C-alpha cells in the first residue's frame, strides 16, 4: 500500500463501496482530524458508515500524492452535500492528509483542514458571524 493507492480508493469512495477501506487501513489505525480521534479499524469503519449515511453526497478529488519511505501525503478537495449545511448545497473543503504505513497498510492518518470552512461557516446564524470574523482578521 502506498499514498497513490490510498488516493485511488478515496477517489472512488461512495456509500456503496466503503468495504474498500478495509484494504487500506491497519487494524490498529489511529485517525485524527479537527473534530475526531479514532483508534482501531472498527471505530474508523463506524465513523465512515455514519458519515456516509448522513450525507447526500461526499466525494474526494485527490490533487497530489507524495511518499517517502513509510510516510505519505495527499492534497485533496472534498465536496460534501449535507441537508443541514448550507441549506443542502455543496460545500467544498481543501485539505491535506498525513499518512504513515505499517505492514502494507495505513497505521496513522491525520487530516488537516479548516473546520470552519467545512462546518461553522455553513451553519445558519453562526456561518455569517464566522465569515465576518475571518474577513476582519484578513484586513
Where do the language-model regions lie?
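A generic structural signal for ordered secondary structure
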Residues: 2, 21, 93-97
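Short, aromatic-enriched amphipathic alpha-helices that serve as compact interaction elements
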Residues: 1-16
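A short alpha-helix capping/helix-coil boundary motif
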Residues: 13, 27, 74-76
